[in-house]
Amino acid sequence: MERLDIAEAYKFWDTLRDGNQLTEIRLIANDGRTASGIFDNVEDLIRCVKPYTNDWNVYYTINRLPDDARGLPQYNKIIVRPKQTCNDNMITLRDYVCVDLDSIRLSGTNATDEQVNYTQKKANEVYQFLKDNGFNPCVVAKSGNG
């Protein structure tokens, strides 16, 4: 079964990208290998990432990269073990701030219903705080394990 949900890839692009804004895709294999690709359109991203989705975990940048990142070797393709990847110093503008809330529990365990409810309550408080303090509407997501 293929793990790439193409509709979700388009949803990501339409929600978090601005036109032909660059995005780095970082891939991490179970054996520790890394790969990187830099894309400015979703069709190339999907085509290049698709072969990796069954055996690699896929991550992406949410904030803006400089236009000259198009000059890196992994522009519009995936390179395994690249010499250079994007880093925090390359971010030119922060469009998003990611807030990750997790319950305190043993590593490798799922949250109890009580922990999920508590974390949801905290997430609602954070959401309201951001809204009350002038932040743009939030993108809210919930993982499957609490």
What is each PLM-predicted segment?
Residues V139-G146:
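Short, conserved phosphate-binding/catalytic loop or strand-edge motifs used
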Residues S107-Y118:
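Short, flexible/disordered intra-domain loops and linkers
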Residues M1-Y96, L101-T109:
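DNA replication initiation on ssDNA origins
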Residues Y118-F135:
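Short amphipathic alpha-helix segments
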